[in-house]
Each structure stands twice: as C-alpha cells, then as structure tokens.
Amino acid sequence: GKVKDDKPAPPKRPLSAFFLFKQHNYDQVKKENPNAKITELTSMIAEKWKHVTEKEKKKYEGLQQEAKAKYEKDMQAYEKKYGKPEKVKKIKKSKKGSK
C-alpha cells in the first residue's frame, strides 16, 4: 500500500479577483434567482463582473494581491518546514481518434 506521510497539505492557491467577486455576490444572485442552476448563476455573476466599475474591480484585485502575498508567505514557511510539495500530475485521458 501507499505510505501516507504526516505532512499537511500545502497552502491553497489564492483565488482570482473574479472568484472573490463571485463569492461575494453569489448569495445575493442566488436569492434573486432561486431556481437558477449553478452554471446559470455563474454566468449571471460573470455578466455583472463585466459591468463592474474600475474602482470596484481594483477592490477585488487588491484582495487578490493580499491573498497572493499571504499564499507566498505561507508557501515559503511550508517549504522551509516540509520541502517543496509534490506536484500532483493530472492524468489526461487519451482520446483515440477515429478516422
């Protein structure tokens, strides 16, 4: 079997400005559209994001920068203590082309 080490998971990557905006607006959009699917809600939020003022976008970009700085600091501390985290390889499913 695979030996599980006691290393904690490395810090999670910071969210993008759009994802922070999405998190911030999701409940409100859901409340306004209770029967919408998640994909529809995401589209609505994306549409809102397109029309957000530069000032508002800067707010989320600032939050993203803070999250990124924290992530980098946490990652340095993690690497100092545990070494670089192993990259998880994504397995690509090969599609057999039929010609």
From Swiss-Prot:
PANTHER family tied to this protein: HIGH MOBILITY GROUP PROTEIN B3, HIGH MOBILITY GROUP PROTEIN DSP1
Native species: Tetrahymena pyriformis
Domain of life, per lineage: Eukaryota
Record PTM Phosphothreonine, positions in chain: T42
Keyword Phosphoprotein included in the entry's annotation: yes
Mod. after translation: Phosphorylated at two positions (Ser-16 and Thr-42 or Ser-43), each 6-7%.
GO molecular function, one term: DNA binding
Cellular localization per UniProt: Nucleus; Chromosome
Main location class: nucleus
Protein name (record): High mobility group protein
GO cellular component assignments: chromosome; nucleus
